[in-house]
């Protein structure tokens, strides 16, 4: 296929798609140019079904530093593992694409997005999402799209689609919404305490804008789209399924209704093992035993799936016996740990998170050097999910995509209420350790983070709580669930996380397993989430009503002084010599910004005070008319040099020592002698002249003797 180009304008910027010129061996490939951002997307599918019990979809978002005219950092000067932002963008694209494949589809699919040029005012992630959907849609991969996504901002009561950098900085909302022509299927958002009504309107505005992008994709697919390949879907043997359902469905139904998680897991596992043992013995000599046992496992999973959903939709019974809108038992604790700067332990049913606060000087901020201009990140929220939290063994190592994503969600939820840098000049790190998990651990980490911040004396604007909402839908009837647990998440259709204060929402995240959800479901879920959020805030505020007025004794204290910008080099010294000497002497940490704000950090107030004295002395300037208690440091024939303070010396000319004539300076002064002097002049080069006699009353002139005349 020769190169074909398709052009439109979206949100005030040119959107150009090129097909047929590059990556022609992939199943589908596109080059998307949005503004001056260029993204190459290639989609590839394996020829055979994978052996696992899940859909092996991999979406990558690769940031090439040349796209922004930069050299990669580090010794190797080559791109390494994806940045946090790249990982989050890959997740952002994966989530709306994944539900658009058929149930039982098991061929491996890879969608690789490579950023070739970068324009900070034209969203490369949104271009990559568009390109991912289009590459799949024009390929022979059986993808039931297209989908598209947009960013939505909110400034002065107006919604803005795909805002530029300046607009996003002024926006009260940073929302990404994706979906198909029919419905929304992915949401990711941070917001400055906006109401449910505004958030819902933003979602609908975003979905409305998506229609234009989907129509553009459909236009392109009509011209260059390939016929979809016939692939084998994972299907179980119908006779085998009927046999197992008839024999064991009643036992599995009973096991599913055991309310306690571990007991329920044991009961369902016992039924499954019994069934597997029977059929493995029955078909032991069959050459297709492996396929049969795979089908047995899949049938049992489908039976459990169907029963959990039936109980909720028909009988309104949840696995643990709760009502549809009921939250699990809550508990909140502060000061769980000694010595740390703040800690909070939050428990919701069998989900428990410990959050630990660390405060540090601003010099500890994380430097983010990606495609965008380098910036410093003051607030970090890290989320850890050890396997013991679900009673299992597993891999331990670097944080995976899920942990990075959950950490970022908590970060968005909490950073909206943090004090400004001027109010609280600290770098802030929260680490959430999930100690138990039965669903909604990311929201528990937000609640625990609120507790840790307030316990640590961080003056947040308001406490934040989070809740996860679920959905069970049969296409006609639906049930929205409050505070979903693991089984409801696993077998449900939606995981809709909502975090916020009493004033409004600070973060949203939605993932679904069906093609999309309606505005009515969104509205109902937001309303139930608000009610639940207020219940959780009641528990948090009963434990700690407001941030403590003081930091923990172990936290670094801070004092800030202002110096003239031209004195910064004096404090730092040649090659950092002066500031290093101060730090070595006092044991403090010092940060100096470009405006002359000097921040001094230490857990020892005396060390801070001593540092302030030293710096004040370094930047102090002599002033004409001021009197100083000085020390003679050098004697010359023409006068004496005296030290006024620190490194500031002055010349006391021989004529300024006394009102009477001084013949030899050394007859009057000696090195090391303390004298009081008054500054009488500072020249344009900063040289200081001082006087001793100016502090001594001038003696009266001697009277003239009368002449005698004979």
UniProtKB/Swiss-Prot annotation:
Main enzyme class: transferase
Top-rank taxon: Bacteria
Gene Ontology biological-process annotations: mRNA catabolic process; RNA processing
Alphabetical UniProt keywords: Cytoplasm, Magnesium, Metal-binding, Nucleotidyltransferase, RNA-binding, Transferase
Cofactor: Mg(2+)
Stretches the record annotates as Disordered: 691-710
Location of the S1 motif domain: 625-693
Pfam family, one: S1
SUPFAM superfamilies: Eukaryotic type KH-domain (KH-domain type I), Nucleic acid-binding proteins, Polynucleotide phosphorylase/guanosine pentaphosphate synthase (PNPase/GPSI), domain 3, Ribonuclease PH domain 2-like, Ribosomal protein S5 domain 2-like
Keyword Metal-binding: yes
Catalytic activity: RNA(n+1) + phosphate = RNA(n) + a ribonucleoside 5'-diphosphate
EC annotation from Swiss-Prot or TrEMBL: 2.7.7.8
Family: Belongs to the polyribonucleotide nucleotidyltransferase family.
Function: Involved in mRNA degradation. Catalyzes the phosphorolysis of single-stranded polyribonucleotides processively in the 3'- to 5'-direction.
The protein's name in its UniProt record: Polyribonucleotide nucleotidyltransferase
Organism encoding this protein: Streptococcus pyogenes serotype M49 (strain NZ131)
Phylogenetic lineage: Bacteria, Bacillati, Bacillota, Bacilli, Lactobacillales
């Amino acid at each position: 296929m020769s190169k074909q180009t398709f052009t439109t304008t979206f949100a005030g910027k040119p959107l150009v798609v090129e097909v047929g010129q590059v990556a022609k061996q992939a199943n589908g490939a596109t080059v998307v140019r949005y503004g001056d951002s260029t993204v190459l997307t290639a989609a590839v599918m394996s020829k055979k079904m994978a052996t696992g019990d899940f859909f092996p979809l991999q979406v990558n978002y690769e940031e090439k530093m040349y796209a922004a005219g930069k050299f990669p950092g580090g010794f190797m000067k080559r791109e390494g593992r994806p940045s946090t932002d790249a990982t989050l963008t890959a997740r952002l694209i994966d989530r709306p694409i994944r539900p658009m494949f058929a149930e039982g589809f098991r061929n491996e699919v890879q969608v690789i997005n490579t950023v070739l040029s970068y324009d900070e005012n034209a969203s490369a992630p949104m271009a990559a999402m568009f390109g991912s959907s289009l590459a799949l849609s024009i390929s022979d991969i059986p993808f039931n799209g297209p989908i598209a996504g947009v960013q939505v901002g909110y400034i002065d009561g107006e919604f803005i689609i795909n805002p530029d950098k300046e607009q996003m900085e002024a926006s009260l909302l940073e929302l990404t919404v994706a979906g198909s022509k029919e419905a929304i299927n992915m949401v990711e958002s941070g917001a400055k305490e906006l109401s449910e009504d505004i958030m819902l309107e933003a979602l609908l505005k975003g979905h409305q804008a998506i229609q234009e992008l989907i129509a553009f994709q459909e236009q392109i697919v009509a011209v260059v789209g390939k016929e979809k390949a016939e692939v084998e879907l994972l299907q179980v043997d119908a006779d085998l399924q009927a046999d197992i359902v008839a024999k064991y469905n009643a036992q599995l139904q009973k096991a599913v209704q055991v309310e306690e998680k571990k007991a329920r897991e044991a009961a369902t596992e016992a039924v499954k093992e019994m069934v597997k043992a029977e059929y493995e013995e029955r078909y032991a000599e069959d050459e297709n035993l492996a396929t049969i046992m795979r089908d047995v496992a899949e049938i049992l999973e489908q039976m459990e799936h169907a029963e959990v959903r039936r109980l909720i939709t028909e009988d309104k019974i949840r696995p643990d016996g709760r009502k549809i809108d009921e939250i699990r038992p809550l508990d909140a604790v502060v000061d769980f740990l000694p010595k740390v700067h703040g800690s909070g332990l939050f428990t919701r049913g069998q989900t428990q998170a410990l959050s630990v606060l660390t405060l540090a000087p601003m010099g500890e901020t994380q430097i983010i050097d990606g495609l965008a201009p380098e910036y410093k990140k003051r607030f970090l929220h890290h989320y850890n999910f050890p396997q013991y939290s679900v009673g299992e063994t597993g891999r331990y190592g670097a944080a995976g995509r899920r942990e990075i994503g959950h950490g970022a969600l908590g970060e968005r939820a909490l950073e909206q209420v943090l004090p400004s840098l001027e109010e609280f000049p600290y770098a802030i790190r929260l680490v959430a350790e999930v100690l138990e998990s039965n669903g909604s651990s990311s929201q528990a980490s937000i609640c625990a983070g609120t507790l840790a911040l307030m316990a640590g004396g961080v003056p947040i604007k308001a406490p934040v709580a989070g809740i996860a909402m679920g959905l069970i839908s049969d296409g006609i009837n639906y049930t929205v669930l409050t505070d979903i647990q693991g089984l409801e998440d696993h077998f449900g259709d939606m995981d809709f996380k909502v975090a916020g204060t009493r004033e409004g929402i600070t973060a949203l995240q939605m993932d679904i397993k069906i093609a999309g959800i309606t505005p009515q479901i969104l509205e109902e879920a937001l309303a139930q989430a608000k009610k639940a959020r207020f219940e959780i805030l009641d528990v948090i505020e009963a434990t700690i009503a407001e941030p403590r007025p003081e930091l923990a004794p172990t936290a670094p204290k801070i004092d800030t002084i202002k110096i003239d910008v031209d004195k910064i080099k004096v404090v730092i010294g040649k090659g950092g010599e002066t500031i290093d000497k101060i730090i070595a002497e006092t044991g403090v940490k010092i940060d100096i910004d470009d405006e002359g704000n000097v921040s001094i950090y230490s857990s020892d107030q005396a060390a801070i005070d001593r540092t302030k004295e030293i710096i004040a002395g370094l930047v102090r300037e002599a002033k004409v008319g001021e009197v100083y208690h000085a020390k003679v440091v050098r004697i010359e024939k023409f006068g004496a040099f005296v030290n006024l303070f620190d490194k500031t010396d002055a010349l006391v000319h021989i004529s300024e020592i006394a009102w009477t004539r001084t013949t030899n300076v050394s007859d009057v002064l000696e090195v090391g002698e303390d004298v009081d002097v008054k500054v009488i002049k500072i020249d344009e080069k900063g040289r200081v002249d001082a006087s001793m006699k100016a502090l001594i009353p001038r003696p009266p002139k001697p009277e003239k003797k009368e002449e005698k005349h004979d």
